Amino acid sequence: MMENSTTEARNEATMHLDEMTVEEALITMNKEDQQVPLAVQKAIPQLTKVIKKTIAQYKKGGRLIYIGAGTSGRLGVLDAAECVPTFNTDPHEIIGIIAGGQHAMTMAVEGAEDHKKLAEEDLKNIDLTSKDVVIGIAASGKTPYVIGGLTFANTIGATTVSISCNEHAVISEIAQYPVEVKVGPEVLTGSTRLKSGTAQKLILNMISTITMVGVGKVYDNLMIDVKATNQKLIDRSVRIIQEICAITYDEAMALYQVSEHDVKVATVMGMCGISKEEATRRLLNNGDIVKRAIRDRQP
């Protein structure tokens, strides 16, 4: 149990925040924010274990599920939503659950975070399985909703991860893979949407991005599995094909159209000079990983 919560402590550097000029306040806030990536850096050993396990479970058909309340919950929903266009994931593969439901994304839902049972019900509603990875996010490390979610996930046999911004957090005792990032007291006392929220966003960026790299949705540093939902992303898709295959934009567009807007298939077609059907077969035989499919010379 936590005896002292640093996320609720007063920050000595901002005791006179209300007396600072705008520029002084900005300089102070920026200086405090600079501590965040350094704090996250210290958690890389733990995050490495989390991501390796997440990759393994994802390859087995498991899902990545974020669960949290308030700012923590919103950040989980945001990261999950961004994975759909970025990595062409199914909306049901990476899920963000927030206490109080979708209404809580824009409005405070009073008391939602205080109910452990509510998290259990939310996880039951998505048919949680032992293959899934549940990441409980709570700056304080003691949010009842997150405690309830992680506890229930453990009973199902799911992989459980906790992300908190306090040492000796309650959720760290529940999760199989605890991650604690000490960002120190907030600029505005107790406002964990600030440094704590920034740390959580950086961590979720790492988890989702590196996991997707690990399951073959990235070629070099390109979004090879991008889902083109607008003109900007269509253009990006074509330029990715153009870049990898070293061809003209028009040639890349032709491949993109023949492949029925599948960047992976189009890339293998262009690199190997083969048909859509053959490119699809090679990807299927090589775990949907483009570099392996390109190297595959089997008839």
Swiss-Prot record:
Domain of life per record: Bacteria
InterPro entries, A to Z: Etherase_MurQ (IPR005488), Glucokinase_regulatory_CS (IPR005486), MURQ/GCKR (IPR040190), Reg_chr_condens (IPR000408), SIS_dom (IPR001347), SIS_dom_sf (IPR046348)
Chain ranges of the SIS domain: 54-217
Protein name: N-acetylmuramic acid 6-phosphate etherase
Biological-process GO terms, alphabetical: amino sugar catabolic process; N-acetylmuramic acid catabolic process; peptidoglycan turnover
Molecular function (Gene Ontology), one example: carbon-oxygen lyase activity
Annotated organism of origin: Staphylococcus aureus (strain bovine RF122 / ET3-1)
Family stated for the protein in its record: Belongs to the GCKR-like family. MurNAc-6-P etherase subfamily.
Further remark: A lyase-type mechanism (elimination/hydration) is suggested for the cleavage of the lactyl ether bond of MurNAc 6-phosphate, with the formation of an alpha,beta-unsaturated aldehyde intermediate with (E)-stereochemistry, followed by the syn addition of water to give product.
Functional summary from the UniProt entry: Specifically catalyzes the cleavage of the D-lactyl ether substituent of MurNAc 6-phosphate, producing GlcNAc 6-phosphate and D-lactate.
Keywords associated with the record: Carbohydrate metabolism, Lyase
Subunit relationships: Homodimer.
Cysteine pairs bridged by disulfides in the record: none
EC number in record: 4.2.1.126
Catalytic activity: N-acetyl-D-muramate 6-phosphate + H2O = N-acetyl-D-glucosamine 6-phosphate + (R)-lactate
Record's keyword annotation contains Lyase: yes
Pathway assigned in UniProt: Amino-sugar metabolism; N-acetylmuramate degradation
Transmembrane segments: none
SUPFAM superfamilies named in the record: SIS domain
Location of the active site: E82, E113
